[in-house]
Amino acid sequence: MSGSGRTIFSFVVDAAYSFTYHGWHLARSLIEHCGGDPEAVHVQCTPEVDQRWRDLFRELGCAMHQISRFGDGRYCNKLNQLESLGTIAFDRVVLLDTDTIALADLRPFLRDDAILGKIVDVANPPLAALDEIAAAAAMRQRPAICKTDTLDADTYIGNCNGGFYSIPRAFCACLSVEWRRWALWLLDNMEPLRRTGCQNHVDQVSFWLAIHQAGLPFAAAPANLNYFIHFDGKHSYLDETRDIALLHHHHCLNVLGLLEIPPGRSPREEAAVLRGNQQIGGGFDNRVFWEMRYQGFPERGSGVGSRGYNLLYKRQLLKEQGVEAAANVLDFGCGDLEVVKELAIRRYVGIDQSSAALDVARHARPDWDFRLTPRPEGQPAEMVLCFEVLIHQKTEAAYRAVIAFLVENTLGSLLVSGFSKNSESIRQNPMVFFHEPLETSLRRTGRFKRIQQVGAHTNVVIYRCDV
């Protein structure tokens, strides 16, 4: 029986940066494809999640919750979601891992008469381990045997990949109690999972135990609702007549924060990844992107503008422009400090939105001052630096707000980079944005007596502006 009524979606955000980055794009994709109601997306944060990231989801309009850790405190935290949703009005809830992204509406696939989950990709754990667990749990009757999604082995019906579960309201209370009960039991009886290297599958195996021990109705979901791309394999549960609705990418991201799979995949998979990347690109946000970049890809850090030849070029340019002679310097968007860390600057304040970048910067120059804030006040300096910040401002309002801040805090000279014109490469890059020629923006402020181009690299120009 197809689902009707109100569907809500829920996922857990933990303290690690990846939860916020993936969760941000997952939440946006659910809002875009699954009804347009931000309040139907429930973000459940563990206690350690920084307030900045809670505010990010709150600004999006999501419903926010805090949940305590459960069991091992790592892989089983999702089990506390159902209890925290107990007072919410809904007809069914979809529990998701954050490393998924919606490409289409999930709701037409859902049912009111059964819990849905997609059978495991491969035999994790093996059938023999499930048999051993079932015997120890005194399971009265084994479930039916079925094939894994890749057809690599047999497993039991209900042994599902944990990235997607759909649960009708009528079964939530029972499943919540039984799932947690069997997870605690399994954590005390881990040997079959430990022996097969499947300790991280406690959540999915305890789900399997819970639905069968409690006699809850279950139906296997099509692979359209939990489509893996992290390895090449058959998707035997795919409904070929319908689109892929939910990708489970398992952190297959590149340095640009986009999905990346090896070449040679099927046209269906390549098209799905393209749609996923369009979704991610449309949701570019400086706060989540740069935290992901500095923590996930520290070798790339601030980007090509602060590495290799460009790094040496900008460092020499700063020396020529007198940065070491300035009484004090304000660096807006200082990043990981690769360009300036070796310069003899006397009084330096670096500002950035990424706590990970500032950790690197503080380690490099503990004698300098660093501040985590997007819009600080009262930081005027004789020389202000702003390299490759304006090009990442998604909206014109954000672009002009940065310029206004730079103008307000420049006592002597501003060195700033940006675009002089639009181009196809800019239009095709979801990370960068053109609003107008930078020189036009600077002259419009009326603040500077002299504006001159003093450099250029990659596809940006650098201006010196003197008050």
What are these regions (language model features)?
Residues 1-73, 88-89, 418:
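N-terminal anchoring/stem segment of glycosyltransferases
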Residues 388-392:
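Short catalytic micro-motifs in class I SAM-dependent methyltransferases
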